[in-house]
Design a protein with these regions (language model features):
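Charge-enriched amphipathic alpha-helical scaffolds
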Residues: 58, 62-81
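Short, amphipathic alpha-helical "recognition" segments used to contact nucleic acids or chromatin
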Residues: 35-47
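Long, charge-rich, low-complexity intrinsically disordered regions
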Residues: 2-31, 37, 78-227
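A broad "ordered helical/assembly scaffold" signature
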Residues: 42-45, 52-54, 71, 80, ...
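Polyanion-binding surface elements
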Residues: 44-66
Length: 227
């Protein structure tokens, strides 16, 4: 089995040569590699997210009010922070507040929406589980992984991951039905997830779900994705 690609070619310096004069990107110096990875990471974040203060400029009370609500645990934390200290959030960061009606109503809205979505996709939705999901939402991590971090997509992600874990716990790669279920699960998860920033695994200390349940599974079971 060939190893899957986890980094773009530009992450290393193609102009580096070994002692024979042959091209050898793997000899890229650590500092240059770090610079390149940081540049790719920064570019992705700026393309996918917007500065919190810019988004909150026209919000009642402006950025100061939004930051106060974040600090008080009433609104989610940012997705990323840039080198200059700029906090970055998705463009639809404040949409749930508008839908809920107010910051004060956001928690109640989240509980109702998650319960309904979880019932539809058959994942746990007891009060304790919903509170854990709410705290995870406030942590801002779902902005990193989901294209639109809503209670519905959070429940949907859980469903896909539960299904995929069950499939890989008892693999049957020669079974067409198993392969189809694996493919649908991987593709369904990919449809709601962001591509992820190149340094996210270092931030989180683990492979990202898009790698674990996407890149790695596609490499491990290529026949399931041959169609």
């Amino acid at each position: 089995m060939a190893y899957p690609s986890t980094h773009p070619a530009e992450a290393a310096d193609s102009s580096v040569v070994d002692l024979t004069g042959s091209s050898c990107p793997r000899l890229t110096a650590p500092s240059e590699l770090g610079r390149r990875l940081a540049a790719l990471d920064d570019r992705y974040i700026r393309e996918q997210f917007v500065p919190l203060d810019d988004l909150a400029a026209d919000w009642p009370g402006g950025p100061a009010a939004v930051r106060a609500d974040i600090a008080a645990g009433r609104l989610p934390q940012p997705a990323y922070r840039l080198d200059d200290g700029t906090d970055m959030v998705p463009g639809d960061y404040l949409v749930p507040v508008a839908v809920a009606g107010s910051v004060a109503a956001l928690h109640g809205w989240f509980v109702r929406e998650f319960r309904e979505a979880a019932e539809r996709v058959d994942v746990p939705h007891d009060p304790e589980t919903i509170e854990i999901e709410w705290q995870d939402y406030l942590g801002g991590g779902y902005f990193v992984c989901l294209r639109h971090a809503t209670p519905a997509t959070m429940a949907e992600k859980t469903r896909h991951i539960v299904d995929l874990n069950q499939l890989i716990a008892d693999p049957h790669p020669a079974d067409q039905v198993w392969c189809k279920r694996l493919r649908l699960g991987v593709e369904g998860l990919a449809a709601i997830e962001r591509p992820f920033a190149i340094l996210d695994p270092a931030r989180w200390g683990t492979p990202m779900s898009g790698q674990w349940y996407g890149t790695f599974l596609r490499a491990l079971y290529p026949a399931a994705f041959a169609e």
